[in-house]
Amino acid sequence: MKRYYSTLLVLVLAHTSLSAYAHTCPDPQTTSLQWGVPPSPWIENPFSPNSPQGEENTRFVRANILVAGYGQGVTCTYRNSVGDFSILWQVRTKIPARVDYSWIETMGGYVCTRGLNECQFYVADPS
């Protein structure tokens, strides 16, 4: 019986550790965004004012968690000389905790403007 419980505990801990991996927006200097191509699984946001442009001075502006009852996706907005552009990852995300002051609750979800590494989010369903 102890063997059963220990095996169950290991499986639960493994699942928890795998699902608790923090994600951030892609870095425009070290990913395919430097060539104007969103890295997989990200896509160009269809509502973005501009297409992704490969430019040396591209910088991160903000991240948004889109909410419709629960997290429906993440958009990351960047700025360069052409203007702003955003990319989208349509994935279920966990809602940030109220004590996570990096994320500010807005009408349509949450926004983070602190920085690329500070705007961490958690995927609820990695598949």
Predicted regions and their residues:
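N-terminal signal peptide c-region/cleavage motif recognized by signal peptidases
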Residues: H15-S17
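Bacterial N-terminal signal peptides that target proteins for export
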Residues: M1-L8
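Mitochondrial intermembrane space
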Residues: Y21-S127
